[in-house]
């Protein structure tokens, strides 16, 4: 059996995993696989168990199921997983279905028994750490969840916030341009309301700070993804981040860097929604704008406090799958390459590697097990090889993760980017020509390589030689991305030559 070079490389990297840590600096070098616990893997290992996303019911995914499929995740080169919230949820089947996703909590001191036991969650953490991998857990501090109208909430069901005194007075957000409304009024609607905790009160702050520190300690958690960050006043977050004692990345669902970037002053990182929108628009069709993406890369790295601590993504459980816009596999490969080789921490959403195409919630919350977990699909292999070269570059260049990605050129269909210290840089060339794109040679200047230097294109494992003028002749075809790395630096890596 022929074994792909990237699997050999990743295996070698895994067994040499460093000691675990959980600081922002340590998270820079991670690569995250995000999954909905209920939708990734079942304890019984079934790949046929029914999961109709339209029903919005529990489908049976568990923490033990994740443990059993860590080879599948690690085989793509991921070094961390992010799982959905673990707290006990509202028990009813609402008109919007079950709280299978984890964002309608009622008891923060109990676990969601649908996913397993406390021992199962601890076992997941241990299983990851034995592999040198990190555990990131999703948390919600903004709200609880209630099956019913906001005007008739029975606050006694919430633990420990069991009276109305802990909450903002009921009002739904009507105007998202009004930050006071965004923070003080409620999400949800009169079918499922999301009672909004008054996080300005010391009793609420202190409860959350104590809770989050205990959660991290009890389950040996390495990082937190924080939901609905913009709906809580900013001065709440530094204390929460400090109490957690690990890297925290917040969801600020807004594409304006002037709005989103300042939240990085109150927590370690945020999801890179400013990049998400131009990234999606650049590659969801063959007529997308490279200008907007080029400009936003530069804006984010100049305006955000630290673009190397942001989370880069194009899919999640709140936004439509990339393949719901286009089934062009070449475009999907380009967008995945960008995610992994841009600044910050790459985040791939479970099912993206199988080209899942669900649209808006709930269609984008498909069961990964229904794919059968193939490891030979085109995107699985591409993601694995991109993670492999990123992981290798990090191991060889201490400055790789803090070097800010530099888009060195653009035209209507192409954007090359450079990341890494001189002599060890990765140059990624992205195209939105699509799978029917023509074959041509791109003469690339500004890559920073030296005349006569040999480079390996690590997707196709071919080589090119830098011209006497310093330009790199890059063969382009079929709209596929290209990733260049100095050939001499690959010695002993198993990458392309294993």
Curated annotation (Swiss-Prot):
Cofactor note: Binds 2 calcium ions per subunit. Calcium is inhibitory at high concentrations.
Disulfide bonds: 51-59, 171-185, 261-304, 461-496
Active site: 227, 251
Positions annotated with a glycan in the UniProt record: 218
The enzyme's E.C. designation: 3.2.1.1
Residue numbers binding Ca(2+) 1: 142, 183, 196, 231
Pfam families per UniProt: A_amylase_dom_C (PF09260), Alpha-amylase (PF00128)
Keyword Endoplasmic reticulum: no
Single GO term (MF): calcium ion binding
Catalysed reaction equations from the record: Endohydrolysis of (1->4)-alpha-D-glucosidic linkages in polysaccharides containing three or more (1->4)-alpha-linked D-glucose units
InterPro entries: A-amylase-like (IPR013777), A_amylase_C_dom (IPR015340), Alpha_amylase (IPR006046), Glyco_hydro_13_cat_dom (IPR006047), Glyco_hydro_b (IPR013780), Glycoside_hydrolase_SF (IPR017853)
Keywords attached to this entry: Calcium, Carbohydrate metabolism, Disulfide bond, Glycoprotein, Glycosidase, Hydrolase, Metal-binding, Signal
Annotated residues for binding of substrate: 56, 104, 143, 225, 230-231, 255, 318, 365
GO term, biological process aspect, one: carbohydrate catabolic process
Source taxon at top rank: Eukaryota
Cofactor: Ca(2+)
Signal peptide from the UniProt entry: 1-21
Sites where the protein binds Ca(2+) 2: 227, 251
Enzyme class at the top of the EC tree: hydrolase
Site features described as Transition state stabilizer, chain residue numbers: 318
Entry keyword annotation includes Disulfide bond: yes
SUPFAM superfamilies: (Trans)glycosidases, Glycosyl hydrolase domain
Family per record: Belongs to the glycosyl hydrolase 13 family.
PANTHER family: ALPHA-AMYLASE 1 (PTHR10357:SF215), ALPHA-AMYLASE FAMILY MEMBER (PTHR10357)
Name of the protein in its database record: Alpha-amylase A
């Amino acid at each position: 059996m022929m074994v792909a070079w990237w699997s050999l490389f990743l295996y070698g990297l895994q067994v040499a995993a460093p000691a675990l840590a959980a600081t922002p600096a340590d998270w820079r070098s991670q690569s995250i696989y995000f999954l909905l616990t209920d939708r990734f893997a079942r304890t019984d290992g079934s790949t046929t168990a029914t999961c109709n996303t339209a029903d919005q019911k529990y489908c049976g995914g568990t923490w033990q199921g994740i443990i059993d499929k860590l080879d599948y995740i690690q085989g793509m080169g991921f070094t961390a997983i992010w799982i959905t919230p673990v707290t006990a949820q509202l028990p009813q089947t609402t008109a919007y279905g079950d709280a299978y996703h984890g964002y309608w909590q009622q008891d923060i001191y109990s676990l969601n028994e649908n996913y397993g036991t406390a021992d199962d969650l601890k076992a997941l953490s241990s299983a990851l750490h034995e592999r040198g991998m990190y555990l990131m857990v999703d948390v919600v501090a903004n709200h609880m969840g209630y099956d019913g109208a906001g005007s008739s909430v029975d606050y006694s069901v919430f633990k420990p916030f069991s009276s109305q005194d802990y909450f903002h007075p009921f009002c739904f957000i009507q105007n998202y341009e009004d930050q006071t409304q965004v923070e003080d009024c409620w999400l949800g609607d009169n079918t499922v309301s999301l009672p909004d905790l008054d996080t300005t009160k010391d009793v609420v702050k202190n409860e959350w700070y104590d809770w989050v520190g205990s959660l991290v300690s009890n389950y040996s958690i390495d990082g937190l993804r924080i939901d609905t960050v913009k709906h809580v006043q900013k001065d709440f977050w530094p204390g929460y981040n400090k109490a957690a004692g690990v890297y925290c990345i917040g969801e600020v669902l807004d594409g304006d860097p002037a709005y989103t970037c300042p939240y990085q002053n109150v927590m370690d990182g945020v999801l890179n929604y400013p990049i998400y929108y131009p990234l999606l628009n650049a590659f969801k069709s063959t007529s997308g704008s490279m200008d907007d993406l080029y400009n936003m890369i530069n804006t984010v790295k100049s305006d955000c406090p630290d673009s190397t601590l942001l989370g880069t993504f194009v899919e999640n459980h709140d936004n439509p799958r990339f393949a719901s816009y286009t089934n062009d596999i070449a475009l999907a490969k380009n967008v995945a390459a960008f995610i992994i080789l841009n600044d910050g921490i790459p985040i791939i959403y479970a099912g993206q590697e199988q080209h899942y195409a669900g649209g808006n919630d709930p269609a984008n919350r498909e069961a990964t097990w229904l794919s059968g977990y193939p490891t030979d699909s085109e995107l699985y292999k591409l993601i694995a090889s991109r993670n492999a070269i990123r992981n290798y570059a990090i191991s060889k260049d201490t400055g790789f993760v803090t070097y800010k990605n530099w888009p060195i050129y653009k035209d209507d269909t192409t954007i090359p980017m450079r990341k890494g210290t001189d002599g060890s840089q990765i140059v990624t060339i992205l195209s939105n020509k699509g799978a029917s794109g023509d074959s041509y040679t791109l003469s690339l200047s500004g890559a920073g390589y030296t005349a006569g230097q040999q480079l390996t294109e690590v997707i196709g494992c071919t080589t090119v030689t830098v011209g006497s003028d310093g330009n790199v002749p890059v063969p382009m075809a079929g709209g596929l991305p290209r990733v260049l790395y100095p050939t001499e630096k690959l010695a002993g890596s198993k990458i392309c030559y294993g």
